[in-house]
Amino acid sequence: MTQSDGAASAEPRELVRLSTDALREFRDRERARYEAIKARATPFNLARGKPATEQVALANQLLTAVATPEQCWTEDGNDCRNYYGSPQGLIEVRRLFAAMLGAPPEQVLVANNSSLALMHDALVYALLTGASDGAAPWRDQHRPIRFLCPSPGYDRHFQICEQYGIDMIAVPLTGAGPDMDEVERLAADPAVKGMWCVPKYSNPTGETYSSETVARLARMGAAGDFRLFWDNAYAVHDLTGRSDRLDNVLDACAAAGNPDRALVFGSTSKITFAQAGLGMLATSAANMRWFVSRQSTRTIGPDKLNQLRHVLVLRDDAGISAHMEQQRRLLEPKFAAVQEVFKARLGGTGIAAWTRPRGGYFVSLDVLDACAQRVVALAKGAGIEMVPAGRTFPYGRDPRDRNIRIAPSFPPADEVRAAADALATCVLVATSERLLADRGVNA
């Protein structure tokens, strides 16, 4: 991930350097452009990281992969149409995703569609029964428990904590992961029990945790029942021909003497069918026993037929890579369109900076302080559906009101380009209004 304010145009056009009269004229021109966009009433959706129809169609073989009774049997003789089998999922599917998760198949669990459900369950099990066998439940701590939340981050992580009354502490990101000096300072508090991490192509900033960051997270002082909720949602989701390197956190934790610290999550939600895929957990052998013993009271087992379909269609690491290359080719032009438009419209203005992600599903846009909510409100008025401003921070509160998450994956590339152009207009209107207000010009 790299951050950009775009290349400067031939003449300096930083808005802050314009005279008040020139800035007022600029604002009025952008307002007129905005009204024209509103009049066209073209709806756009940049709200969520939703795969496009063409992307999910790449996995249509899943629809027919298991078509006869004879195909329903596993290599160890289990009928996938019936009850039971390993609570960790088929050994075939655990082998398939072991490399992606960074663990041997024995330390992998493959469940039903949602990795978010696995994160939720792991947190609730720790809250109610302790984070390891014999440990005190988190809820029985003498002080309210706390979670570290690298921000901007994934809103659904934060919603789990909010749902269960877990205090959240925002930690700034650096471009190579969270500010580790701050993380280490905060984690020394025994009331801090966990940390949310999207370590590769982070949502929404696109950054990948550096080797130093992973090593420090693995070895830092923390409560004995502190857990890294390592949501590796974008493990194989590159936008360029070269994948970012992410160190294996399970190996790093084991080497640091904290083998049970990390819970690694993944899914096929943005690989095959977004809501008919597989969720996964990889962790230490002790943690796996802990999780399975609790999960077994919740469910007899996962959808084995769907696991078998994925094995038959994706086959092996090479099959996953080939499939994701097709995904990349569909996504890359959409992200390129956002970059081209922002460079042309916002470059050199001094009022916006945005990421150029090498993978993942988002572009993170920072505007002038106290402007993000106004930008998103203008976007809504122009028919652009966005995630609410502030949603990328704990409790939905961006302390600087500047971050906006952009999800270009779902619309066609031409619509992404038009939406990015309309959004740029909203940014220019909102920020020119703010600069004028700072000069005492409110009309």
What spans do the regions from the language model cover?
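Short, solvent-exposed loop/turn segments at secondary-structure junctions
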Residues: G49-T53, S115-L116, G153-D155, A176, ...
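Conserved core segment of the aminotransferase class I/II
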Residues: A111, D251-E332, R345, S432
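N-terminal "arm"/small-domain region of PLP-dependent enzymes with the aminotransferase-like
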Residues: T2-Q88, A98-A99, F226, G381-I384
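Conserved core of the PLP fold type I
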Residues: Q71, D79-G224, A235-G257, A372, ...
